[in-house]
């Protein structure tokens, strides 16, 4: 049986990792062992941050909605509760967009929420 040598596969694997590490500083882009660690860690950060991005955007939307609602004399929690009672189903992303770019429409929504809370 012939001896199996893995030089070709090793070279390909090393090239793949070094290609992924392109643009990294110093040994992180040149030395396979260091580059492998850097690429692995980068993958872990990317995986974690794809999930964190969703949380961070929701936090941003809530902060914007809260600021706009308070300018109209209503807290965030009461505003959201009022919208639910008024059967207005607009998600936080769209509400934040309305709060930033269309203040008149947001004021209208706040009035609807206040009316449903009073009723």
Curated annotation (Swiss-Prot):
Record-linked InterPro entries: Ribosomal_bL20, RIBOSOMAL_L20_CS, Ribosomal_protein_bL20_C
Taxonomic lineage of the native organism: Bacteria, Pseudomonadati, Pseudomonadota, Gammaproteobacteria, Alteromonadales
Xref: PANTHER family: 39S RIBOSOMAL PROTEIN L20 (PTHR10986)
This protein's GO CC annotations: ribonucleoprotein complex; ribosome
Protein encoded by which gene: rplT
Protein known as: Large ribosomal subunit protein bL20
Top-rank taxon: Bacteria
UniProt cross-references to SUPFAM superfamilies, sorted A to Z: Ribosomal protein L20 (SSF74731)
HAMAP family xref list: Ribosomal_bL20
Biological role stated in the UniProt entry: Binds directly to 23S ribosomal RNA and is necessary for the in vitro assembly process of the 50S ribosomal subunit. It is not involved in the protein synthesizing functions of that subunit.
Species this chain originates from: Colwellia psychrerythraea (strain 34H / ATCC BAA-681)
Family the entry assigns: Belongs to the bacterial ribosomal protein bL20 family.
């Amino acid at each position: 049986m012939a001896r199996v040598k893995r030089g070709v596969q090793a070279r390909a694997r090393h090239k793949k990792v070094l290609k992924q590490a392109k643009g990294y500083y110093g040994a992180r882009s040149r030395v396979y062992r260091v580059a492998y660690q850097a690429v692995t860690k980068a993958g872990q950060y990317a995986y974690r941050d794809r999930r964190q991005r969703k949380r961070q955007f929701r936090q941003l939307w809530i902060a914007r909605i809260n600021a706009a609602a308070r300018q109209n004399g209503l807290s965030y929690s009461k505003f959201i509760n009022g919208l639910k009672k008024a059967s207005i189903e607009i998600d936080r992303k769209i509400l934040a967009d309305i709060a930033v770019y269309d203040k008149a429409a947001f004021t209208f929504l706040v009035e609807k929420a206040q009316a449903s809370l009073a009723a």
